[in-house]
Amino acid sequence: MDTRLLELLVCPVTKGPLEYNREKQELTSRSARLAYPVRDGVPILLESEARTLSDEELGL
């Protein structure tokens, strides 16, 4: 994923920053506890497509 694009994207729920997980092909929002999929290089920033992050994934 292009780092310039990542700097512009925000979580649609919290408007907070997103972190890219290359291995899982996801953008994560720690504040919303959601992970948005990236498919074929395109971030899918729909809450209905996101999965909830566990405490373990958040390092809590």
Swiss-Prot record:
InterPro entries: Trm112-like. Gene3D superfamilies: 2.20.25.10. Belongs to the UPF0434 family. This is UPF0434 protein Rfer_3156. It comes from Albidiferax ferrireducens (strain ATCC BAA-621 / DSM 15236 / T118) (Rhodoferax ferrireducens). SUPFAM superfamilies: Trm112p-like. HAMAP family: UPF0434. Pfam families: Trm112p. GO terms for cellular component: cytosol. It comes from the Bacteria.
